[in-house]
């Protein structure tokens, strides 16, 4: 089986014999029921391949759809002229950058369809091109725009530049409304949906299908599609790991599944990571490693964001679908970028509970964050976590605490602001990472942090205090009876009292009692 990893061209997928998960019924439904659509999905989720498939369909390339749903659904196969714009290729670091990309597309079209001297701005040129294309072919035009938001995403930390891009694109995309009589179909994709003064504010005819129940499976791979198209690949994976088919499916689900694009939505697998796993035979962090969320980390640090809230707060749909660079909250960007997903929905209050979609994202994001909050070199998280886990598994709480103290040494330059919040965030990341390898429960609340960790042979009860003493922490373990539930447990139990010094921003004392 040939896996189309990184291949976004539908004709190439079909002609070269790559496996294709049939999404063409969605395309037929869109084309037959409406005209103007917008879809947001995380990067590497199949948006570009979807756009390419639409391109082939509207050009009437029936031969490419043999055996697919569209072959029988479509009766006429009318050929339409298609304008396909992809903004993913540019580097948008100056005001001229967007103009150069748009100008390249417009010049190529004007070489074919001409230009009037009065058409001096991108939007006027685009307007004239659409009209001339429609008149020349005596057929309305199909407009496909891939990664509409790439310029604004690249400028999200530069409000002035982003505003320039927004104004340019708002005028450019407004042509889709003014030239409605010449347009058959328009489809725009991107990662985000920008709020406030949106580039789409003039397009009241644009239907956002990003959270539409009918189209939640339009990108990505569902469980049914996994077992329909890739059952033999799942079996190959199972054979390589020496497990059965169900166990292999469970491993893949835990690692790559879990995306939800609406309340009570179906589970969607990350297609990029899944295909890479089938190709290599190895579980990995394929999606996460293709792009680092460095700007998102800067947002979290800038706002002194309380990290547990990433997976504990409930938010509204309007909040989720609004991204703006001014006083921006990191949560909508994390959601729309694929680092968070919908976990639950409260119908009474119409709010969403968010969480990491799967193990790949949760582990990758946590490992990536930890060096920004502790005294750790970048890319060293897996090594440190391994050492922590080995200390726990071997019954070495003193060694564990020495490593913990090192992580909090000399970190004042990394995080400014509230020292207690800094410690809570770092502690959250450490326990989150430990939880991938050991059984960990933790509580982080006002004035209190504790952790219970369990391995095959040991149980550890940690109590952390601020500007107190290790003895005070140990007394609380006894007075609150934290060890009582484990009285009959044969595993050896350690009580660990820890004090965090706010002024020095470090762990300055700990004691261990067994």
Predicted feature residues:
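Structural motif
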Residues: 142, 458-460, 494
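Mg2+/Mn2+-dependent nuclease catalytic core
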Residues: 162-167, 466-483
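Metal-dependent nuclease catalytic cores in nucleic-acid-processing enzymes
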Residues: 172-179, 332-340, 428-432, 476-496
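Domain-level recognition of nuclease-like catalytic cores that cleave nucleotide substrates
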Residues: 485, 489-514
């Amino acid at each position: 089986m040939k896996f189309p990893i990184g291949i976004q061209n539908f004709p190439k997928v079909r002609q070269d014999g790559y496996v294709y998960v049939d999404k063409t019924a969605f395309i037929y439904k869109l084309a037959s029921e409406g005209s103007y659509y917008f879809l947001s999905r995380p990067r590497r989720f199949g948006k570009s391949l979807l756009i390419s498939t639409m391109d082939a369909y509207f050009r009437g390339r029936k031969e490419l759809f043999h055996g697919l749903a569209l072959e029988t659904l479509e009766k006429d196969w009318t050929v339409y002229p298609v304008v396909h714009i992809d903004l993913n290729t540019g580097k948008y670091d100056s005001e001229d950058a967007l103009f150069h990309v748009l100008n390249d597309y417009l010049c190529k079209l004007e070489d074919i369809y001409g230009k009037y001297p009065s058409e001096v701005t991108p939007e006027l040129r685009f307007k004239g091109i659409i009209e001339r294309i429609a008149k020349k072919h005596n057929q309305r035009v199909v407009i496909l725009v891939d990664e509409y938001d790439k310029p604004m995403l690249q400028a999200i930390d530069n409000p002035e530049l982003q505003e320039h891009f927004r104004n340019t694109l708002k005028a450019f995309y407004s042509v889709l409304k003014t030239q409605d009589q010449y347009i058959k179909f328009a489809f725009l994709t991107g990662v985000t949906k920008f709020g406030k003064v949106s580039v789409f504010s003039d397009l009241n005819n644009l239907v956002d299908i990003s959270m539409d129940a009918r189209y939640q499976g339009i990108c990505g791979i569902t469980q049914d599609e996994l077992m329909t198209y890739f059952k033999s690949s799942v079996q190959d994976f199972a054979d390589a790991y020496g497990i059965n088919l169900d166990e292999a499916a469970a491993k893949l689900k835990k690692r790559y599944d879990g995306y939800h694009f609406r309340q009570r939505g179906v589970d969607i697998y990350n297609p990029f990571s899944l295909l890479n796993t089938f190709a290599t035979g190895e579980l990995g962090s394929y999606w996460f490693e293709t792009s680092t969320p460095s700007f998102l980390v800067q947002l979290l640090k800038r706002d002194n964001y309380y990290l547990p809230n990433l997976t504990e707060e409930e938010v509204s749909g309007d909040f989720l679908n609004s991204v703006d660079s001014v006083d921006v909250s990191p949560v909508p960007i994390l959601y729309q970028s694929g680092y968070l997903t919908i976990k639950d929905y409260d119908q009474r209050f119409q709010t969403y509970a968010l969480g990491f979609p799967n193990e790949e994202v949760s582990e990758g994001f946590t490992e990536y964050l930890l060096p920004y909050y502790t005294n750790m070199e970048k890319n060293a998280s897996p090594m440190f976590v391994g050492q922590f886990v080995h200390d726990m598994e071997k019954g070495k709480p003193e060694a564990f605490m020495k490593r913990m103290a090192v992580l909090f040494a000399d970190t004042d330059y990394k995080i400014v602001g509230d020292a207690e919040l800094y410690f809570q965030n770092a502690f959250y990341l450490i326990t989150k990472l430990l939880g991938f390898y050991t059984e960990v429960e933790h509580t982080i609340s006002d004035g209190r942090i504790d952790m219970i960790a369990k391995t095959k042979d040991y149980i550890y009860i940690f109590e952390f205090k601020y500007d107190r003493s290790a003895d005070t922490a140990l007394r609380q373990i006894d007075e609150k009876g934290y060890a009582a539930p484990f009285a009959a447990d044969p595993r050896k139990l350690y009580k660990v009292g820890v004090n965090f010094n706010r002024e020095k921003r470090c762990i300055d004392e700990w004691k261990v009692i067994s």
